[in-house]
Amino acid sequence: MTGGQSCSSNMIVWIPDEKEVFVKGELMSTDINKNKFTGQEEQIGIVHPLDSTEVSNLVQVRISDVFPVNPSTFDKVENMSELTHLNEPSVLYNLEKRYDCDLIYTYSGLFLVAINPYHNLNLYSEDHINLYHNKHNRLSKSRLDENSHEKLPPHIFAIAEEAYENLLSEGKDQSILVTGESGAGKTENTKKILQYLASITSGSPSNIAPVSGSSIVESFEMKILQSNPILESFGNAQTVRNNNSSRFGKFIKIEFNEHGMINGAHIEWYLLEKSRIVHQNSKERNYHIFYQLLSGLDDSELKNLRLKSRNVKDYKILSNSNQDIIPGINDVENFKELLSALNIIGFSKDQIRWIFQVVAIILLIGNIEFVSDRAEQASFKNDVSAICSNLGVDEKDFQTAILRPRSKAGKEWVSQSKNSQQAKFILNALSRNLYERLFGYIVDMINKNLDHGSATLNYIGLLDIAGFEIFENNSFEQLCINYTNEKLQQFFNNHMFVLEQSEYLKENIQWDYIDYGKDLQLTIDLIESKGPPTGVLPLLDEEAVLPKSTDESFYSKLISTWDQNSSKFKRSRLKNGFILKHYAGDVEYTVEGWLSKNKDPLNDNLLSLLSSSQNDIISKLFQPEGEKSSSAGVEANISNQEVKKSARTSTFKTTSSRHREQQITLLNQLASTHPHFVRCIIPNNVKKVKTFNRRLILDQLRCNGVLEGIRLAREGYPNRIAFQEFFQRYRILYPENSTTTTFSSKLKASTKQNCEFLLTSLQLDTKVYKIGNTKLFFKAGVLADLEKQKDVKLNNIMIKLTATIRGYTVRKEITYHLQKLKKTRVIGNTFRLYNRLVKEDPWFNLFIRIKPLLTSSNDMTRTKKFNEQINKLKNDLQEMESKKKFLEEKNQKTVNELENTQDLLNQEKENLRKNESLLNRVKTSSETLQKQFDDLVSEKDEISREKLEVAQNLEEAHQKIQGLQETIREREATLEKLHSKNNELIKQISDLNCDISKEQSSQSLIKESKLKLENEIKRLKDVINSKEEEIKSFNDKLSSSEEDLDIKLVTLEKNCNIAMSRLQSLVTENSDLRSKNENFKKEKAALNNQLKNKESELLKMKEKIDNHKKELATFSKQRDDAVSEHGKITAELKETRIQLTEYKSNYQKIKEEYSNFQRETKEQEQKKRNSLVESLNDSKIKELEARLSQEISLNQYLNKRISGNSVETNISSTRRSTSYSDDPLDKEDIIKKYYDLQLAFTEITRNLENEIEEKKNLISRLRFTETRLASSSFEDQKIKAQMKKLKKLIQDMDPSIPLDSILNEPLDNCPDKESDINKLMLEVDYLKRQLDIETRAHYDAENAISALHSKFRKIQGESSLSSSDIYKLKFEASEERVKSLEDKLKTMPLRDRTNLPVGDIIKNRDSISKYEEEIRYYKLENYKLQEILNESNGKLSQLTLDLRQSKSKEALLSEQLDRLQKDLESTERQKELLSSTIKQQKQQFENCMDDLQGNELRLREHIHALKQAEEDVKNMASIIEKLKTQNKQKEKLIWEREMERNDSDMQLQETLLELKRVQDVKKILSDDLAHLKERLSAVEDRSQYTDEINRLKEELNCSLKAETNLKKEFATLKYKLETSTNDSEAKISDLLKQLDHYTKVVEMLNNEKDAISLAEKELYQKYEALNTECESLKGKIVSLTKIKQELESDLNQKTDALQISNAALSSSTQKNKEITEKIKYLEETLQLQMEQNSRNGELVKTLQASCNGYKDKFDDEKQKNIDLYEENQTLQKLNTDLQLQLKNLHERLSDTTEKNAWLSKIHELENMVSLETDLKYEEMKKNKSLERAVEELQTKNSQQTDVIELANKNRSEFEEATLKYEAQISDLEKYISQQELEMKKSIRDNSSYRDKVQEMAQEIEFWKSRYESTMIGSKNIDSNNAQSKIFS
């Protein structure tokens, strides 16, 4: 992310700072300086930091390091992708602000960034879980819906909820990737996700009642949660950064069933830190399990494990670790939690003992010490018996395996002696391997116990893995972690790329897509590529295999392969170090110890010893790979499966290769899921609350890929805002110079159009923003600029507003003081006058005294009357109160009755609850039975397996016995042989003795032989003794084996007996269950029959819904038509108003121009008359001729292209068809080609869609420009016509040149001028005629194209070979070959189209759209030519006016002109007739060709003959073209000669030439037709095709009729438009009149206002006099107000009673609904009562009818309730009216005397009494209606009780039917929504087609107007000629 993003001067920016990382400053200016190191020029910003008070403190910063600050409206934004300036300091600032407010979660596009708060926050309670889980009920996924106003704040629960919702809605696997540094909170967040998923699937205890089935689910979820303490004990350790740091990565799969409930879990683990077992940092600890084991076990248990003490210092692998007390870690409590978790998950006591035994072994191995007797051989210093007993191996074997391991060298075994260092290395490797294998075993056992066994539908995977690591010393482990993070970042980039692409496609926005995943591929290849060149890890694997390899040799190889070969690799300054460029930054690695870490071997001798251990756990852990079935995690992570190749089949695998395999499987799993990303961040290394280390967090943001994601977002349009929000926020920025009325007139109903108006007024570059379908997309920084503009504008508005307010307050004060002064003057004058009259006038004194006495008698009578009336009113009030009491009593009765009904309802509810409990019991019993059945089946299977195993063991034992017996026999045979040999030897001895006695002479020889024989005897005796010992041992073994066999046989017999008894019980139970099953099946069949009946009723409902849909569609169409017509009329009104103003201004300009022009013409008339005539004539005629030739050539070119394209495509298609038909392919080749074509087709369709979109945009732009050009040319023509009229009028009025001078001119110059004029006029007429012909040709071409369209559609309907896919491919091919075809078509001659196949016709159908566009382009050129012609006409009219002044012989010229005009008209008519005949012949010819094309499929056998016909037609076409060119040349020659000859000769020659041309054309066409007929007669009889030709002609006539009807419709529409414009103008005039009238009324009202103000002044004086009287009346008013308050309280009580009754009604309705819902749970009880199945159908119908009746009645009750509410509102209104009347009374009291006030008050009281009586009467009515309602409810209740009793008997069918109906209704709703979408699409298409039709109509009207203007021009010329005659 680079800086300098549109930074301008005086702008607040971020600049880098050493302490604070980034600081705010004000950019004062920019400058350019040279860099000292590079010598290049750099732009530098001069910034004033805001934190410094000194003004002179300025800092120079490179502009690339300057970043703009976001407006304050974007502070603490929840999604950082919404920041309009996306840069590092803005992201840091936003996170810091949120972190200070304990907002630890923030979205960053697809990421959720989570910062560790280091203290407990109330964010994970049950309320929060309910809030996020119930979110989708209120709104549809707040995070996805960006425009929702009820967005919930970012949270880890929101990610979990989104994953869960996607799992249910999409049915796709989900994954949540949680990464970050150690201590950032990865494990805690994964725990929270697990907690959330477990709670929403099982339900919290507060919300869900414990049912028998739910407890199992809760225990299963508890198992998943309890796996965390086990993994933390064995996989977590205390580090410098984190007290509970996970030292391994894990991928937890939480499996769900089809109902969305947790069905199982599976854990896979990665990269366990084995080196920690042997060596730790002094400030860190080993794994928790070692400390928990020593502190948690009893002394006896420790002794059993051969552990002598609890002290950590007594164990060498723990003595160097941190031994301080760690806050938050209690080893004893954690060990208890571990034991409970192991028990909950399902570990047996033996398994737990084995696990602890392995941990103890590792502790004991660490304490082994060595004594080196020699340098080469080591020996143990301490006793090893405890280790060997725990391992279950012989002590001597263990010593030899460690100190003198045996290895195979060739065919011999060789022992190698090890020194103390080497032996220690072997022991360390053993402890590492033991712990790793133990960890794998524990994970396997957890997975085994968490496997539910049933089928799982989908899963949510939680990946908790270490984030990117950059330390001071980075080794092999950091490379593996960073490599995985690099791959994960690439995965994220690809995922983000796909989402961006889909978003832009959905919003219909053009964007050049970039694959961001390729950015990281170089680094990944550098690490993993197998070459060439070979990556880092494969090189390490090669070195690991080679003998005598070292870290230095690996380093030298690495440098030689990668140094200066990759931009991502650098050589380090450190020894044996190198630098890799990752996405997060450069990392320096050292290769020390990499080979040993990659291998980590155990010798074969030790492995074989451990695999044959007597300890079960050790033998299992070191079992060969072929014999053990382990999970993926253990298979991937157990390190030493490569040993003892002779004994096992596995090969040597290094750590890096296993890690790569792990990574591939992980990424494949993630790729098949929908991923969600969580990035955890550690705020500081001190573990303090609310300390925000900016530099540390910035490094983590880089490492976590957050800034990388923001960088990718900047490439597109990161800021997205809804239309309505944008319009409301930035509407104020509309420019002030354009009035608000014009802007409001532009505003429309759709906010999208309003936003478009606003954006155009803001003059933003279109590259900066894009308009989507639902929202606006902005580049980074655009919204910030708009916010600044908005702030500036609001500031200006506020300044103006404050100024106006202040002015208003000052003016108000001044006027108030002036009024005071005036009032005081008036009062002073009145008092002076009063005093003067009292003093001076005695009559006035007499009047003052007598006046009060006169009115006293009248007052007495009035007071009596008033008293009587008051008494009457009091009596009336008492009667009203009595009635009121009576009504209240009735009300209480009704309330009591309602309470009784409620009690009845409660009783019914209790009954329902009992039934529900029964149902639940039945359900639970059925579930338990089913489970027992399943258990029995499983037990049966197990027994059968055990039986088979026992049988196998017996057979093996028999075989062994037989083998032993055979060996015994063999040994006995050998004994017998030895006995026989012994006997023989004895015989030999006896013989020898005889020989000795006989032969004493040979004693020496005999002695020697004797000695030899004695030796042999001894030897034989030894052999005999050994053999006897062997026989004894064999006999002992035989006896022991026989005893063992006997014991085993006894136990087997017992087991067999038990199994047989179990089997018998199972068989009986099985038979019972089968019988029950059959009963259930019978009941099911009955239910299915009833379901069929309900389905028939559903079909009827569907038909009704379809009818409703049709009605809706018609209404929507009518509404859309009305809206569109209204919009058009309003738009046209606006345009007409604008045009009126423009015409007025143009008229004034024309007047001024004309006055100037008149002055100039008077001065330069005589000078330039002759020269202008000659020069202009020549130049204009040449220009017009050139343009005419261009127009003709263009028309020819179009015709050639249309014919040529069709011929070419036909030939290609015929060749293809013949090739396909002639060469049959094998099946295999066809299949291969089919697949290849499929692949090609997919690629072509993608390209096609992109090109179609581009083409649509281009077409829309072209149409817009066309309409603008047409409108501008039309306006220009109107202005020119007005100019001509004005000029004619002025010239007629001002005859400046005298007639005498013109008559007296010499006659010599007249003939030349006459000839010139004649030439000019003839040339102009000829050019006009040619233009008419060309325009008609254009119209003919368009008509031909439309006819082709219609025919192609019909042929398409008839032909079965074509398809939409072929059309798309052919359309694309024709699009790509347009350019080449254009070049070819210019050179190619016209070809006959008689032999075109149908396939090519279909192709032409698609290519016609392209030609339509080209025709539009040529139309535009025609428009331009027409404008030029109009200009020439204007200039010619000027010339004719000039020539009028020099009319010496006008009579002769006018006669000649008239004659010529007549001749020309006659020739034009003839030409028109000829052209019409030619057109008809052309149409006939084209019809014939189309007929032949339609019959091409039947004529495939005669292709060769048709090719010959094509060649003939080509020749004929070339001849026709030549003849046409010759005719054109002849026409030109004739036209030149016509000017020289007489008028009669000209006429004759023209007619003859035209006749000859027509005859030639007719002959050519007749020859062509004859030739074609001959060809066709040779092929097939033409009689077959005559009918088809007639049919096609009829279709053509129909299309022509349709065109005429359309024209008529266009004319009517135009007439309606004109009438509407006239009406609107009339209305406008009426409105203006009304305006004048209202202005007059306002003036009158102002005058009246002045008079009222004077009257008010007089009244004010009276008011002061009457204040005293008012005070006396206040007491009486207070009493009346009290009465009124009492009445109001009565009213309120009655309204409360009404509300209570309404509430009771609503509660009753709700209870009824609940009753209907709870009836669904009565399945099992109803199944027991299936005897009454015969009455089910009738009862269901009656229930439906009654339910419908109840619904209607409830609706009536609701309506009555609404009426009551409305009446209540009327009462409230009356109350307000009474209050107003009171106010009026106060005012009247101030105005009149006391007596008048009393009278008015009495009248008002009478009115009030009458109103009260009316109200009371109405309340009586209401009470009666309520009583009726209560009675009806009682009756309903009784009916409902009856109905419920019936429903309790048989309701199961109805329930199932309703469920199915609901499902079908939901399907129907989906179908309706799809239909609505299709309707919307069709409406859009309809509107687009209407727009097209309107455009065509506009074009037609334009051409009509052009034609009319030309006709008017010709008529004007005629009139001018006539005037010239008159003047002559």
From Swiss-Prot:
Keywords associated with the record: Actin-binding, ATP-binding, Coiled coil, Motor protein, Myosin, Nucleotide-binding
Region (Actin-binding): 460-529
Single GO molecular function: microfilament motor activity
Location of region: Disordered: 629-657
Coiled-coil spans in chain: 856-1911
Record-annotated Myosin motor domain positions: 75-791
GO biological process, one term: mitotic cytokinesis
Domain IQ: 794-823
GO CC term, one of those recorded: cellular bud neck contractile ring
Listed InterPro entries: Kinesin_motor_dom_sf, Myosin_head_motor_dom-like, Myosin_N, P-loop_NTPase
Binding site for ATP: G180, E181, S182, G183, A184, G185, K186, T187
Segments forming domain Myosin N-terminal SH3-like: 8-71
Biased composition (Polar residues): 629-641
Function per UniProt: Required for cell division.
Family named by the database record: Belongs to the TRAFAC class myosin-kinesin ATPase superfamily. Myosin family.
Note, other: Present with 2140 molecules/cell in log phase SD medium.
Name of the molecule in the record: Myosin-1
Source organism: Saccharomyces cerevisiae (strain ATCC 204508 / S288c) (Baker's yeast)
Gene that encodes the chain: MYO1
